UniProtKB/Swiss-Prot annotation:
Top EC class of this enzyme: hydrolase
Protein name from the UniProt record: Lambda-carrageenase
Gene3D superfamilies per UniProt: YVTN repeat-like/Quinoprotein amine dehydrogenase
EC code: 3.2.1.162
Length: 942
C-alpha cells in the first residue's frame, strides 16, 4: 500500500509524456483538474486545506485535491477497484475520513491526511457499498456487499454487529436453470437518510440479480435487527445509482435513484420517505432527443437552475434538467461529446464535480452552476489529459500509416471478414477500402426483425422443447420464399452476406432447408450465419446439434459458409468439452465453425481467448472470431458505465485479437470513422494477420480440458445472480474460479489459471491480456485416457510453428482439479501441481524467441524467412496509460529492431532486453530481423 502526500500544487508529468496544469474550460464556469488516472467516482469533503475533492481511480487509488487543482495526497490501497466510497467526519475533528468498499472484500478507512486508519474485512467477497450513520451522538460505519451481510463497524474499525440478509429479505428467484436461495440478497447500496428532527435512518437497497431485478428498499432504525419498512422499487432493471437529496429544503431527505440499463429501459425515480411514494420517469420517452444506444447509469442530484430547484441527471454524455414534475418530457437537455463516470454535488459550494470521461479520460471537472454560462461550457467541454493524448496518438498512427509500404518479403494479407459493419455511416470509406485492398472483406449484414414462420411440427416432432421455442425479439412472419428473397438479394454486388440465423432462445429462426437454399444462391460467395448464446444441456439440445447445427456445418463446409458461434461466459473452456460437442472438437467440420464470444457480463476474457485459440491451434477449427459491442465494459451490470464515445478500447481489442489470428470480426457499428483505422492497418499490411503455424508467442505449456466438472460448468456460466456465495462451497479450490455473479472486480487466487498463466489479477475486463511468459492455450486433451477418439485434427504440434514440435508440455484439468494422463492421479487446484505448472511456464518461456513484460499485451509471428513481427498493445482496456514493453530475447539474436510505421530503431542491452515505449491507447508494430529462419531450426537448438 503506497501513500503519496503533496504539500503544494505541482504540475504533474502525465503518463502520456507531457505536462498539463489545471485547465479551465469556458473561463470560470468549468475548471478541469488533471489527475493522471482514470477517475471513476468523485466525492467532496473538508480536509486540512479546506473543502476538497476526493477521487477513486479505475484501479482503486484514492486521492485528494483542492478545488484549485492542488493535489494533496493519494493512497493506492489494495490495487483493486473500489465499488463505493463515502466521505464523512466520524471522529469529530472537523475533517473527513474516507471509506472505501473494495473489491478485495475489505472496507478501508483513510485519514484526512491520506494515511490508512484501519481495514475491516472477514473474507475476500467484494464489498459493494459503504456509508456512515448517526445514532444519538455516535457515528458508525455501515457496509455490505456480495457475502449477503450488513456490517456495523465502529469508528476504530471493530465489528459491532452483523445482520444477515436472510433474516429479512423478500427477494424472489425466477426462471429456469440453477437458482440461488430465495429470500436473500446482496447489498447494492446502503445510505443514511436524514429527517428534519436530526435523526437518521438507514436505507439498504438489496438485490439478487444484476440484470433482471431492481431489488427492494429495506429501511432500518440504527442498529435494528429488522427493517421497520420495506418497499418495492418502481423502475425496472438493476439500480446503478442511489443518493439522498432535499429538493424542497425542508430538512427531510428524499432518495433519487437511476437504473443501469440501455435506453429502452433507462429510468429515474425519486422516493419520499414519509409515505414511501415514488415518482418515476422513463428516459426512453425522450430517446429521440438523446444519443440512443449504449448502456448508462442515470445519476440525479438537485441544483438551483435560474433560481429554481431542479433535478439534474447525468446520463452518459447528457445532462437532463428536470423540473419538480419529475417528467423528463419537460427536461432541458445539455449534450456533450463524451460520457462521464460520475457526478457529485459539493453542498458547501453547490458546485458539481464530474469524474473522468469514460473513454480513458484522466481529468475531473468542476462545474460552477452559479455561472450563467455553465450550460454552454458543459456542452463545449473538451477534456484534455489522457483522452486528448489517446486521440492524438491515434492520429499519429494514421499519419505514419499513410507513408507505409508493406515489405515485399511478406505474403499478401489474409482475408479478415468484418461481418457486421454498417455501410450507412461511412460508405465512402468502406468502398475505398474495397477498391484498394483484398483484405479486409466487408459482408452485407442483415438485421432480421422478421424471421421465418415454418412448420416445425414434423421436423421437431420428437423435440417439443425446441419445437415451441421462440425469441421474443423476433416477429415470425416470413414464408420460406420471403426469407430466401430477403437474404439472397444481399449477395448482389458484394463479397457475401451475414446475418443472425438463430439464437440460444431459438436456434431455428431460419429452417435448415431455407438456409441451405440461401447459401447455394450465393454461388460460392462467403456466407456467415451468426448464432449468439448457444448453450444447452440434455437430450433436447443434443437433437438440435445433430438435426440442425452439424448438418448445416457439413453443408457450409462445401459452400464457403460459416457458423459464427457467438457464445458466452466460459463456453469455449467448459461446455465445448461436454460429450455432445465432440463433433466440433474432432476437426471434421473445422472449416465451418468459427468460435466467437459475446462477453458482456463476463469477467474471464483472458480465458476465452486462450480457449478459442486452443481449439484453433489444435485443429478443431480453422478460424476464430471476435466481437465488440457497446456493453463490452459491462462486467458489472449494476454499474454499466458503458458509453464510451471514443472506442479506443475497442480498437485496441480488435487489433490485439487480429494480430493473434482472429479473422472474423463482429463489431457493433459505432464511430466507424475511428474504428476504420483497423481496416487500413489490415489493408496496407501494417497489422500482420498470422496463420496459426506462424505464431511464436504461444507458451509451450498448455492446459487441456477433459469433460468439465459439472459444478465448474454450471457456476462459471451462471453470472447474473449475485447471491451464490457460500463460505463452505467457495472455499473449495478450482482451476478456473470466482466466475459467477458474486465476484465483480474480485482478486484472482494464486492457483487460478488467470493469475499464474495470464497475470490477470482481478475478475474484470482483461480483453487485452498480457500473458508475459507466452499465451497458455486451453486445448483439447492430446494424450492419454481423456483424449477424444476418432478425431481428424492431428496433434497440437502438427498445427503450430515447427519450433513447438518437441517442446510442448500438457497438463489436464476438468476446471476443478488436475489429472495425470491415465486419470489415476487427481490433484487439487491449490496443490503443488499449480506451482509445477507455473514453474514450467517460466522455464519453457526461455524456448520462445522472445517474451514481453511491462503491462503491454504482445503477439509475435514469423512474417518472413528471417523476420518476426512483434505487435505491442496498451493493455489498459478502460484505463489506458503509457506502458514500457520490456522485450527479452531468448532463442534468437536480433540483427535489427524497427518500428514499421515510425521507423524508430531499438537495440537490446547486454542482457538481451530492449525497452519499447507504448503510448496511452496505442499500439506498435515492430519488425525484428534475425540471423536465420526459425522454421529450419531444430527445437533442441533453441
Amino acid at each position: 500500500m503506497k501513500i503519496k502526500i503533496l504539500s503544494a500544487m505541482i504540475a504533474s508529468s502525465l503518463l502520456i509524456g507531457c505536462v498539463i496544469p489545471t485547465v479551465k474550460a469556458s473561463q470560470s464556469a468549468i475548471k478541469s483538474i488533471e489527475t493522471n488516472r482514470t477517475i471513476t467516482k468523485v466525492r467532496t469533503g473538508m480536509l486540512s486545506g479546506g473543502s476538497s475533492i476526493i477521487t477513486t481511480s479505475y484501479e482503486g487509488t484514492v486521492a485528494a485535491y483542492k478545488f484549485n487543482g492542488e493535489k494533496l495526497w493519494e493512497n493506492e490501497l489494495s490495487g483493486f477497484m473500489n465499488h463505493d466510497i463515502w466521505v464523512q467526519d466520524i471522529n469529530g475533528d472537523g475533517l473527513v475520513e474516507i471509506f472505501a468498499a473494495n473489491a478485495d472484500g475489505n472496507v478501508y478507512c483513510i485519514n484526512s491526511d491520506g494515511s490508512l486508519k484501519w481495514t475491516f474485512g472477514l473474507n475476500e467477497v467484494p464489498m459493494n457499498s459503504v456509508t456512515v450513520i448517526s445514532d444519538a451522538d455516535e457515528k458508525y460505519v455501515v457496509a455490505g456487499g456480495y457475502d449477503k451481510n450488513l456490517y456495523y463497524i465502529s469508528a476504530n474499525g471493530e465489528l459491532l454487529k452483523t445482520i444477515e440478509s436472510s433474516a429479512y429479505s423478500e427477494e424472489g428467484v425466477f426462471g429456469d436453470g440453477v437458482k440461488p436461495e430465495a429470500r436473500t440478497h446482496t447489498v447494492n447500496f446502503v445510505r443514511p437518510v436524514k429527517s428534519s428532527d436530526g435523526t437518521e435512518k438507514l436505507v439498504v437497497l438489496g438485490t439478487n440479480n444484476s440484470l433482471q431485478s431492481s431489488g427492494r428498499f429495506y429501511i432500518f432504525e440504527p442498529f435494528a435487527d429488522l427493517p421497520s419498512e420495506k418497499s418495492r422499487i418502481s423502475i425496472k432493471k438493476g439500480i446503478g445509482d442511489l443518493r439522498t437529496v432535499d429538493f424542497d429544503n425542508d430538512g427531510n431527505d428524499e432518495l433519487t435513484l437511476g437504473n443501469s440499463a440501455q435506453i429502452g429501459d433507462a429510468a429515474i425515480s425519486v422516493m419520499n420517505l414519509d409515505d414511501l411514494s415514488q415518482k418515476k420517469s422513463q428516459i426512453n420517452d425522450i430517446a429521440r432527443r438523446i444519443d440512443r444506444f449504449g448502456y448508462r447509469v442515470a445519476q440525479t442530484e438537485v441544483v438551483m437552475n435560474e433560481g429554481t430547484p431542479t433535478y439534474l441527471t447525468l446520463f452518459g454524455s447528457r445532462i437532463l434538467l428536470t423540473p419538480e414534475s419529475f417528467d423528463v418530457n419537460d427536461s432541458e437537455i445539455l449534450a456533450n461529446k463524451y460520457s462521464y463516470y460520475d457526478i457529485w454535488k459539493d453542498k458547501s459550494s453547490n458546485k458539481l464535480v464530474l469524474a473522468s470521461a469514460q473513454s480513458g479520460g484522466s481529468q475531473v471537472h468542476i462545474i460552477d452552476t452559479s455561472n450563467p454560462s455553465w450550460k454552454s461550457a458543459y456542452e463545449e467541454l473538451e477534456p484534455q489529459g489522457k483522452l486528448a493524448a489517446i486521440q492524438e496518438n491515434t492520429r499519429e498512427v494514421e499519419r505514419q500509416l499513410s507513408n507505409f509500404q508493406k515489405p515485399t518479403r511478406e505474403r499478401a494479407p489474409l482475408p479478415v471478414y468484418f461481418i457486421s459493419e454498417s455501410r450507412n455511416e461511412i460508405p465512402a470509406t468502406i468502398e475505398r477500402s474495397e477498391s484498394l485492398y483484398d483484405s479486409p472483406v466487408f459482408l452485407n449484414y442483415s438485421t432480421l426483425p422478421n424471421v421465418e414462420n415454418w412448420d416445425r411440427s414434423e421436423v421437431l416432432a420428437d423435440n417439443p422443447k425446441y419445437r415451441d421455442k421462440r425469441d421474443r425479439r423476433k416477429n415470425y412472419t416470413l414464408s420460406s420464399e420471403e426469407m430466401f428473397n430477403k437474404l439472397s438479394a444481399g449477395y448482389e454486388s458484394s463479397d457475401g452476406i451475414s446475418q443472425w440465423a438463430g439464437h440460444g432462445n431459438d436456434p431455428y429462426m431460419i429452417s435448415l432447408a431455407t438456409m441451405k437454399r440461401i447459401i447455394s444462391s450465393g454461388d460460392g460467395k462467403k456466407t456467415v450465419n451468426i448464432y449468439p448464446e448457444i448453450e444447452g444441456h440434455g437430450d433436447a439440445f443434443n437433437k438440435v446439434l445433430n438435426d440442425h447445427f452439424y448438418p448445416l456445418a457439413e453443408f457450409s463446409s462445401e459452400n464457403n459458409a460459416n457458423l459464427f458461434m457467438r457464445n458466452k461466459h466460459t463456453f469455449w473452456q467448459s461446455t465445448i468439452y461436454a460429450p455432445e460437442w465432440s463433433e466440433l472438437r474432432s476437426g471434421r467440420l473445422a472449416d465451418a465453425f468459427v468460435p466467437a464470444m459475446e462477453e458482456t457480463t463476463d469477467k474471464s476474457m483472458e480465458m476465452s481467448v486462450a480457449g478459442r485459440m486452443g481449439l484453433w491451434a489444435a485443429g478443431s477449427v480453422d478460424n476464430w472470431g471476435e466481437r465488440y459491442a457497446r456493453d463490452n465494459p459491462s462486467f458489472d451490470r449494476l454499474r454499466q458505465h458503458s458509453h464510451q464515445m471514443v472506442p479506443n478500447h475497442a480498437l485496441r481489442q480488435i487489433i490485439y485479437k487480429i494480430a493473434s489470428g482472429a479473422r472474423y470480426i463482429n463489431n457493433f457499428g459505432f464511430n466507424q470513422e475511428y474504428m476504420s483505422l483497423a481496416w487500413e492497418l489490415i489493408g496496407k499490411g501494417a497489422l500482420y494477420v498470422p496463420k496459426r503455424e506462424e505464431l511464436l508467442s504461444l507458451s509451450p505449456v498448455h492446459i487441456s480440458m477433459k469433460e468439465p466438472d459439472p459444478i465448474y460448468r454450471e457456476t462459471s456460466n451462471n453470472v447474473k445472480w449475485t447471491t451464490f456465495y457460500d463460505e463452505e462451497k467457495d472455499s473449495i479450490p478450482y482451476v478456473f474460479s470466482r466466475l459467477n455473479g458474486t465476484w465483480p472486480g474480485a482478486k484472482t487466487l494464486p492457483w487460478d489459471y488467470s493469475n499464474y498463466a495470464a497475470d490477470t489479477k482481478e475478475r474484470r475486463l482483461d480483453f487485452i491480456p498480457k500473458f508475459p511468459k507466452g499465451l497458455v492455450l486451453i486445448t483439447p486433451v492430446q494424450q492419454g485416457k481423456f483424449k477424444d477418439e476418432g478425431t481428424v485434427r492431428g496433434t497440437l504440434a502438427d498445427n503450430m510453428h515447427p519450433i513447438y514440435k518437441d517442446i510442448m508440455k500438457e497438463y489436464i484439468t476438468d476446471g476443478k482439479n488436475y489429472y495425470n494422463a491415465n486419470g489415476e492421479q487427481v490433484m487439487a487446484a491449490d496443490s503443488v501441481r499449480y506451482r509445477q505448472i507455473k514453474n514450467k511456464i517460466e522455464e519453457k518461456s526461455n524456448l520462445l524467441p522472445m517474451t514481453v513484460s511491462g503491462e503491454a499485451a504482445w503477439v509475435v509471428a514469423q512474417s518472413a524467412r528471417k523476420h518476426l513481427r512483434l505487435t505491442l498493445v496498451d493493455s489498459g482496456y478502460l484505463n489506458p496509460s503509457n506502458k514500457v514493453a520490456k522485450v527479452k530475447f531468448n532463442s534468437v539474436t536480433p540483427v535489427a529492431i524497427v518500428d514499421v510505421l515510425s521507423g524508430e530503431t531499438f537495440s537490446p542491452d547486454s542482457n538481451g532486453v530492449v525497452e519499447i515505449p507504448v503510448l496511452a491507447g496505442a499500439f506498435r508494430f515492430i519488425d525484428v530481423k534475425i540471423t536465420e529462419d526459425l522454421r529450419n531450426m531444430q527445437s533442441s537448438t533453441l
